[in-house]
């Protein structure tokens, strides 16, 4: 079966415009049958690569210059780390929300720190209970900062909630990590090795 797969030739039914014009000229001269001629398959060698798309025919220097270009919002005033303002306002992520919490509970709690522009509490479809997090939006940075300082690590409906910025500027991994940098071994830990034997 493997030998038969190597002997197969690839057939291309796409025709170039010039070949189509030549075939039409032959039909007009009466070289063909009375009807329209059937397409003739062209055999394509395996060495030819067909490519399509936006980057076809571009030089490698153009491709290399566009490789690392991304859309971004430049903030010349504060290029460092910290919170990032969304289009509407300053959005906080509240995690650790109790399952039976309602939007009114969160709204009443967070409205003490300023005008809550929007509040979204995600609910589980099957049960109707909260998924455990909420998004709270404030108009001003000061109100959001006050809410974070006051509510982070406090009790809300007998559960400890953690409040932080939903969007932040800077790298994904902080330069000063709390975990020590050490090489990981490729061998499995002893507790897993005992289970496999």
Swiss-Prot record:
RRM domain: from which residue to which, for each copy?
90-168
Where in the sequence does UniProt note compositional bias of the Acidic residues kind?
Answer: 1-28
**Transmembrane segments annotated in the record for this chain:** none
A GO CC annotation given for this chain:
cytoplasm
* InterPro entries per the UniProt record, alphabetical: Nucleotide-bd_a/b_plait_sf (IPR012677), RBD_domain_sf (IPR035979), RNA-bd_8 (IPR008111), RRM_dom (IPR000504), RRM_RBM8 (IPR033744)
Ligase keyword on record: no
Matching Gene3D superfamilies, A to Z?
3.30.70.330
Pfam families in the cross-refs? RRM_1
Subcellular location(s): the record lists: Nucleus; Cytoplasm
In alphabetical order, the GO MF annotations are:
mRNA binding
Please indicate if the UniProt record lists DNA-binding as a keyword: no
Q: List the disulfide bonds.
A: none
Coiled-coil intervals, chain numbering: none
- How the protein assembles, per its UniProt entry? Heterodimers with MAGO1 and MAGO2. Interacts with EIF4A3/RH2 and RH34. Part of the mRNA splicing-dependent exon junction complex (EJC); the core complex contains MLN51/CASC3, EIF4A3, MAGO and Y14.
Membership in a protein family: Belongs to the RBM8A family.
Q: What is the name of this protein?
A: RNA-binding protein Y14B
Source organism per entry reads: Oryza sativa subsp. japonica (Rice)
Report the gene name.
Y14B
């Amino acid at each position: 079966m493997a030998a038969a797969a190597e002997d197969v030739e690839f057939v291309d039914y796409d025709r170039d415009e010039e070949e189509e014009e030549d075939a039409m000229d032959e039909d007009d001269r009466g070289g063909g049958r009375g009807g329209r001629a059937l397409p003739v398959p062209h055999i394509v060698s395996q060495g030819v690569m067909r490519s399509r798309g936006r980057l076809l025919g571009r030089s490698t220097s153009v491709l290399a210059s566009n490789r690392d270009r991304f859309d971004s919002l430049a903030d010349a005033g504060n290029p460092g780390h910290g919170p990032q303002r969304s289009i509407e306002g300053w959005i906080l992520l509240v995690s650790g929300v109790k399952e039976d919490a309602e939007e009114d509970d969160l709204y009443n709690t967070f409205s003490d720190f300023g005008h809550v522009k929007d509040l979204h509490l995600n609910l589980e479809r099957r049960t109707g209970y909260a998924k455990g997090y909420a998004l709270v939006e404030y108009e001003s940075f000061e109100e959001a900062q006050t809410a974070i300082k006051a509510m982070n690590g406090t009790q809300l409906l007998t559960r400890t909630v953690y409040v932080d910025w939903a969007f932040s500027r800077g790298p994904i991994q902080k330069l000063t990590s709390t975990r020590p940098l050490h090489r990981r071994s490729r061998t499995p830990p002893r507790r897993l090795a005992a289970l496999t034997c």
